[in-house]
Amino acid sequence: MSSSSSSSESSPNLSRSNSLANTMVSMKTEDHTGLYDHRQHPDSLPVRHQPPTLKNKEIAKSTKPSIPKEQKSATRYNSHVDVGSVPSRGRMDFEDEGQGMDETVAHHQLRASAILTSNARPSRLAHSMPHQRQLYVESNIHTPPKDVGVKRDYTMSSSTASSGNKSKLSASSSASPITKVRKSSLVSPVLEIPHESKSDTHSKLAKPKKRTYSTTSAHSSINPAVLLTKSTSQKSDADDDTLERKPVRMNTRASFDSDVSQASRDSQETEEDVCFPMPPQLHTRVNGIDFDELEEYAQFANAEKSQFLASLQVPNEQKYSNVSQDIGFTSSTSTSGSSAALKYTPRVSQTGEKSESTNETEIHEKKEDEHEKIKPSLHPGISFGKNKVEGEENENIPSNDPAYCSYQGTDFQIPNRFSFFCSESDETVHASDIPSLVSEGQTFYELFRGGEPTWWLDCSCPTDDEMRCIAKAFGIHPLTAEDIRMQETREKVELFKSYYFVCFHTFENDKESEDFLEPINVYIVVCRSGVLTFHFGPISHCANVRRRVRQLRDYVNVNSDWLCYALIDDITDSFAPVIQSIEYEADAIEDSVFMARDMDFAAMLQRIGESRRKTMTLMRLLSGKADVIKMFAKRCQDEANGIGPALTSQINIANLQARQDNASHIKNNSSTTVPNNYAPTTSQPRGDIALYLGDIQDHLLTMFQNLLAYEKIFSRSHTNYLAQLQVESFNSNNKVTEMLGKVTMIGTMLVPLNVITGLFGMNVKVPGENSSIAWWFGILGVLLLLAVLGWFLASYWIKRIDPPATLNEAAESGAKSVISSFLPKRNKRFNDRSKNINVRAGPSNKSVASLPSRYSRYD
């Protein structure tokens, strides 16, 4: 008989499932490379036995009703444990009742361990087994019980679950070091639980809970994974300020140091590139928004900020060693933040002392605020300075946080990356991060007004952590989050379960910037009651739309679809000024091509090339917008006609499955109630928006056609200008040829004169040597006579030469020699007459092969 039977005999109360779980826990895959027979190895993990009295008390306690939610305290960002792949079905609530652990708890512990082992990937199985073996070591040391809260990262808020799924557990621990044996059931060894005394436990039981039964959505992986964190039923002492728990970041699977850590990191990077179907949403959402997720992230970010402030108080030699670990909100993955966030790097100005610079900055800001209040308003609703726009002089702009303003003697100017706007409010809240959106004592539920009025959250250069929080809080699909994070460049409209996603392009409109006309991607997530916008560059469209909303609030029903239309319309209108400037440039260049003769041809060619480049850039930006608007309008018409989206893609099929799962889950869990009439139906644009979209499409088509016309003008002007340059080059060559011809004529006239003077200058007896001076005048007169005669003869021959009438004749004349140009050309009529005479003549003695033809002219 194998060792498994002996272990079962030693434990008569152990069920078959427990024996199987113990057998699976005892496997060590790292020690075996071949086939493995688990029956050859004994069970090494003993099972705890509880007395019947404790068992009965624990079962009686497990049927107690849950305490309602009162206040938010424990968050899943405070401590995170990555245990592996655990099914996400069923809620596990563990509360301390001052008693031990019975066999039922041990049974579920072993079953959970078996599930952990069976669902784990092979690369992590060897690493998970040694940790699981430590979870079930029998402790002989009796310590007073304690409140241990273990919360799964994504749990169900169901108060009517059975005692098998919701077994209440109490784990005992003391103030002894961590080296003592632990009794927690499903807690990984990496989670260190602080110990408390019995008196503290009872005092905590008497105090109300701050946060209970908070629910979050499930996380998706290759196997349905569950990240276990602190329990939702954990009780926190609100009055005890000295016992504050240090927040712990969520540990990813790549954070464990083991033999297969590198393989785990590679596997995690592979999983991040793959989008999985969304599991059923298990959150308690209000108008589609999970405010608990935002509150938890805000508490986590504030705790990390306070930790950063505390690190500033350490000596200077420790600052530089910890600066890489404390600065910023870095994510737990390999990419700590978005690369586009570098565009918003704060400007640094060196100061003498940190305290003095901070005080001076505060005094200067107070003076500016007082000056703005005293200054009379010339035009109501319009203010200047501090980058404000019309109607935003009362905006809630939080002051600079000392965590960012001063560090190591430098002052930073924090950019506002988040803007929140509500249709029923005249103020726009600007903040540098998500926690700064709410003021002290305010919650996100109050900020969004429960999500009932139309809200708008604008995010500029979101980090990975912020993007993850927003995706979970607003139910954004992983495909949409991936498109935003990877900055998808294709313009499109996609329909999802609870929203539709629009990707649209704008451009940098600052003419002084070196990135002028560079495309900027704008991503719009349109929900039923609000809009989310993301961009990775500074744009002014959001401020323009907010000003437009304030002006038309009394005339237009401002909803999420109208905000999306207004933003697209403002992006489209931003192309008009640039296109108009190109129109003026095209007219000026077209006139300059035929009129300007003395201008620099290099500057003119550069001007034409720059204008053509701008035109082609705008055409590329506008090329896909008409199709997007057409698709958008079609969706609106389908909504008006009552036609739903076709199930022609994997995305819609996955959304339909997720909707069915959500419906079945809501039907089965009657205790989880949504406080409003939020129904998870497929979201489509409103039908009345199609009329406005038609106007945008007309503008896009008109601008694109104008750009096509301007591009043709620039192309024709470029060709004409090059032709003008060629004509001017031919004219210059002709002038040079004429000048050389005149010089040659003068030289020809002087040659015979040199002959005559040379003859009389010879040392021989010449006529008139001994007589009068009349010979000298006679010779001079003959020379002048010859010169005048030669001049008249040359002028006669030059007049008989016909100037070139065409460019081909000019080219032929330029190719001829100077002497041949003086030969007179025959008259055209004479040439035609001679050809006719030759044609009428009889047959000649020449052969047919010697006659020119179209086949032999090039031989």
Swiss-Prot record:
It comes from the Eukaryota. GO terms for molecular function: inorganic cation transmembrane transporter activity; magnesium ion transmembrane transporter activity. GO terms for biological process: intracellular magnesium ion homeostasis; magnesium ion transport; monoatomic cation transport. InterPro entries: Alr1-like, CorA_cytoplasmic_dom, CorA_TM1_TM2, MgTranspt_CorA/ZnTranspt_ZntB. Residues 28-42, 55-73, 144-154, 193-203, 353-375 have a biased composition (Basic and acidic residues). GO terms for cellular component: cell periphery; plasma membrane. Keywords: Acetylation, Cell membrane, Magnesium, Membrane, Phosphoprotein, Transmembrane, Transmembrane helix, Transport. Belongs to the CorA metal ion transporter (MIT) (TC 1.A.35) family. Plasma membrane magnesium transporter. This is Magnesium transporter ALR1.
